[in-house]
């Protein structure tokens, strides 16, 4: 069947191919259109055949990898179908020339293949029986070659004339028609009017297989055109593999669009620091961590950055790379050089306060100055309530707790906690050894000449723009005069409470005082429900009750050894302490009496004035307590005289007990004497109840008293005051 179909196609094509080519060329030259159908000799028994001409130059490459069936068809066409007379009449450029290259069946490189490229016009006759036959032959050859059934065949579109369609044929023979929207836009069809116009060839990469399909009268035929590349080694790529390659490709990086006039800045997430470079931000972030990777190999000190380590090493080696251009000074760091030039040469103050006219050379001093406006004191002592605006003053204050004295007098080797105190010591104690430089404008005496120049420049130089006093409206053009004027406001209590008579010198004290009126307690404990008006009280509460590692400070009295948690409490106790026995002196007794009298006075003021004097308790003033005589104990008669005992300090009289109504004031205030007592059981004759009576036993002299004395004693017992029973009366009752 295949051979008969091929012979019929070749016989019919031989007779009209040359004439058809000439007619088509003439019609295009004249602007005419091609006829829709060609009148060909038809055989009614075999069925009509229609021949469609594809007038284009196609480069065909014949290789050993082509299908054997197609090679056989081309061989038959070349051998037995062309007549000798037809070959002589047809031009050489219009004849299909096929050449078979026999190659060994072994793996060879693509570069060793010999390619034969012949431009041929392809004319394809279409028959009703040829489509099924070619499709069946193709499926048989695919099964013989052992190709994967799941591997689809790749189809690529080419610029096609009108009447053609692009289809995609799978491995199992399924045919899929591509829509017109999926194809690339075609060129304008006006090129058909000009026979000399040739459409531009489109460059395609790795075109493996293309299928052209056209239909006429319900008959369609697929034509495959193969194109092999020299660099391809593994055959045709499948459509699935192509999708995988596209899926694995990394998306392009988004381009950074920089807007003109906008400066890019980096901001720290932990504070308000901003910088124009990423490297500066990375260096700043190290300040929020304790990481110090760069270590000095000489002293072991660690630093956050290499620059700080390099500057530190210069201190070991004595290298000063930064030299001042205006003088002979040299410095370790560039910051020291800039600060030196501003102080000594340029006198530039770039950091200015936004609230007043203050300007500074260093930004740290500006921050400290701004805290004087806001009242902020972030640096607080952990041992007391002291708070400072800068770290320098806090360190100086901490020396009062630790006892450190880093400053030493070079003459007498006395040590001091502050440098100013040491300078004053030298000026006062060692005036003969110190050169004095007197200021011509004030009474200041300075030890060094350079310090005198600094003093004159800072204190007595004329300021064009006068400075205003921070406490009043006075304006001064000299800093020294301004400072002396502000000292007059030092002890002035400028801040006064609008709800009471309280006044203070500092604003922060007034803020804390007003909280006593409003009841505001903004500082709350995170572990309990306590709230406080001051942060110092909150910190003290937290350490005392919630910090397990807190050890309270112990202030020991040097006289008695008693410990206190506060220094002022210990100092007040030491003023009244008498010694290790814990007996307080005269000052202590007076202090306690005065405190008790003050409390009674405050209590008496709070009582209602409507109370009667009879019901009210008599209050004792301090004078009454002091004038009240102390009760003295009469000495007992001794039978034999004894030498007097050594003098002992007389203990102060104990405070009088509170008086009660209905009893004489004299008896309750008498101190109890330690005398021997005896318990006597007395039985009542009427009821028979037994009562225990405590009786004091007095020591009697060895000699028996006379009878007259007994009678006097019995008479004395009968005259007991207030009708109370005395031990003598009880004994006489028992005798009776």
Curated annotation (Swiss-Prot):
It is found in: Nucleus, Nucleoplasm; Chromosome; Chromosome, Centromere. Keywords: Acetylation, Activator, Centromere, Chromatin regulator, Chromosome, Chromosome partition, DNA-binding, Isopeptide bond, Metal-binding, Nucleus, Phosphoprotein, Repeat, Repressor, Transcription, Transcription regulation, Tumor suppressor, Ubl conjugation, Zinc, Zinc-finger. GO terms for molecular function: chromatin binding; chromatin insulator sequence binding; chromatin loop anchoring activity; cis-regulatory region sequence-specific DNA binding; DNA binding; DNA-binding transcription repressor activity, RNA polymerase II-specific; RNA polymerase II cis-regulatory region sequence-specific DNA binding; sequence-specific DNA binding. The modification N-acetylmethionine is found at residue 1. A zinc finger (C2H2-type) spans 266-288, 294-316, 322-345, 351-373, 379-401, 407-430, 437-460, 467-489, 495-517, 523-546, 555-577. Coiled coil: none annotated. Sumoylated on Lys-74 and Lys-698; sumoylation of CTCF contributes to the repressive function of CTCF on the MYC P2 promoter. InterPro entries: Znf-C2H2_CTCF, Znf_C2H2_sf, Znf_C2H2_type. The modification Phosphoserine is found at residues 402, 609-610, 612. Residues 667-686 have a biased composition (Polar residues). Residues 638-656 have a biased composition (Pro residues). There is a cross-link at residues 18, 219, 698 (Glycyl lysine isopeptide (Lys-Gly) (interchain with G-Cter in SUMO2)). It holds the Pfam family zf-C2H2_16. One of its GO terms (cellular component) is male germ cell nucleus. There is a cross-link at residues 74, 698 (Glycyl lysine isopeptide (Lys-Gly) (interchain with G-Cter in SUMO)). Transmembrane segments: none annotated. The modification Phosphothreonine is found at residues 289, 317, 374. Residues 202-211, 593-604 have a biased composition (Basic residues). Chromatin binding factor that binds to DNA sequence specific sites and regulates the 3D structure of chromatin. Binds together strands of DNA, thus forming chromatin loops, and anchors DNA to cellular structures, such as the nuclear lamina. Defines the boundaries between active and heterochromatic DNA via binding to chromatin insulators, thereby preventing interaction between promoter and nearby enhancers and silencers. Plays a critical role in the epigenetic regulation. Participates in the allele-specific gene expression at the imprinted IGF2/H19 gene locus. Belongs to the CTCF zinc-finger protein family. Interacts with CHD8. Interacts with LLPH. Interacts with CENPE. Interacts with BRD2; promoting BRD2 recruitment to chromatin. This is Transcriptional repressor CTCF. It comes from Mus musculus.
């Amino acid at each position: 069947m295949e051979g008969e179909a091929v012979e019929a196609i070749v016989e019919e094509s031989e007779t009209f191919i040359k004439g058809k080519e000439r007619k088509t060329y003439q019609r295009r030259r004249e602007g005419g259109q091609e006829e829709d159908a060609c009148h060909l000799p038809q055989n009614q028994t075999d069925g009509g055949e229609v021949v469609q001409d594809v007038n284009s130059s196609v480069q065909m490459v014949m290789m050993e990898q082509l299908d054997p069936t197609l090679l056989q068809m081309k061989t038959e066409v070349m051998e037995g179908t062309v007549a000798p007379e037809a070959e002589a009449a047809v031009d050489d450029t219009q004849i299909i020339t096929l050449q078979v290259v026999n190659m060994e069946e072994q793996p060879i490189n693509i570069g060793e293949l010999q390619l034969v490229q012949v431009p041929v016009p392809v004319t394809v006759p279409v028959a009703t029986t040829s489509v099924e036959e070619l499709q069946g032959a193709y499926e048989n050859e695919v099964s013989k070659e052992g190709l994967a059934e799941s591997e689809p065949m790749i189809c690529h579109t080419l610029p096609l004339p009108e009447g053609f369609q692009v289809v995609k044929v799978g491995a199992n023979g399924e045919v899929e028609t591509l829509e017109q929207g999926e194809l690339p836009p075609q060129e304008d069809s006006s090129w058909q009017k000009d026979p000399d116009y040739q459409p531009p060839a489109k460059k395609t990469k790795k075109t493996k297989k293309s299928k052209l399909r056209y239909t006429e009268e319900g008959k369609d035929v697929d034509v495959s055109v193969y194109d092999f590349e020299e660099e391809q080694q593994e055959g045709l790529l499948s459509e699935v593999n192509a999708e995988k390659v596209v899926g694995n490709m990394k998306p392009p990086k988004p381009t950074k669009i920089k807007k003109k006039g906008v400066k890019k800045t980096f901001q720290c997430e932990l504070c308000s620091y901003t910088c124009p470079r990423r490297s500066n931000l990375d260096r700043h972030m190290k300040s929020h961590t304790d990481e110090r990777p760069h270590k000095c190999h000489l002293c072991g000190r660690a630093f956050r950055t290499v620059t700080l380590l390099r500057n530190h090493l210069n201190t070991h080696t004595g290298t000063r790379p930064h030299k001042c251009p205006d003088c002979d000074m040299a410095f370790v760091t560039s910051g020291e050089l800039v600060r030196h030039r501003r102080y000594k040469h340029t006198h530039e103050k770039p950091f200015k306060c936004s609230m007043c006219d203050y300007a500074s050379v260093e930004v740290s001093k500006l921050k400290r100055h701004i805290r004087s406006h806001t009242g902020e004191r972030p640096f607080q002592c952990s041992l007391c309530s002291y708070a400072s605006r800068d770290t320098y003053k806090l360190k100086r204050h901490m020396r009062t707790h630790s006892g450190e004295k880093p400053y030493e007098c070079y003459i007498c080797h006395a040590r001091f906690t502050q440098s100013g105190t040491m300078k004053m010591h030298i000026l006062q104690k060692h005036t003969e050894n110190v050169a004095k430089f007197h200021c011509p404008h004030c009474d200041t005496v300075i030890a060094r000449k350079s310090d005198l120049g600094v003093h004159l420049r800072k204190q007595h130089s004329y300021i064009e723009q006068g400075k205003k006093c921070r406490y009043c409206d006075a304006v001064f053009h000299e800093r020294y005069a301004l400072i002396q004027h502000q000292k007059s406001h030092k002890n002035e209590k400028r801040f006064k409470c609008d709800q009471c008579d309280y006044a203070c010198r500092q604003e922060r004290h007034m803020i804390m005082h007003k909280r006593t009126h409003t009841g505001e307690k903004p500082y709350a404990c995170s572990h309990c429900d306590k709230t406080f008006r001051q942060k110092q009280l909150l910190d003290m509460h937290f350490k005392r009750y919630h910090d397990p590692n807190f050890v309270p400070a112990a202030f020991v009295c040097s006289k008695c050894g008693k410990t206190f948690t506060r220094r002022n409490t210990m100092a007040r106790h030491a003023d009244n302490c008498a010694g290790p026995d814990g007996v307080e002196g005269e000052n202590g007794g007076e202090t306690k009496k005065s405190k008790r009298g003050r409390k009674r006075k405050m209590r008496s003021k709070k009582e209602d004035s409507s109370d009667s004097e009879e019901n009210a308790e008599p209050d004792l003033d301090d004078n009454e307590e002091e004038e009240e005589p102390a009760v003295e104990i009469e000495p007992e008669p001794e039978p034999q005289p004894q030498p007097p005992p050594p003098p002992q300090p007389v203990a102060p009289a104990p405070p009088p007990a509170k008086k009660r109504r209905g009893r004489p004031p004299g008896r309750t205030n008498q101190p109890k004497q330690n005398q021997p007592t005896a318990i006597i059981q007395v039985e009542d004759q009427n009821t028979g109840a037994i009562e225990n009576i405590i009786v004091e036993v007095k020591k009697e002299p060895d000699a028996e008293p006379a009878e007259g004395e007994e009678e006097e004693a019995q008479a004395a017992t009968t005259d007991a005051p207030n009708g109370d029973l005395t031990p003598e009366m009880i004994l006489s009752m028992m005798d009776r």
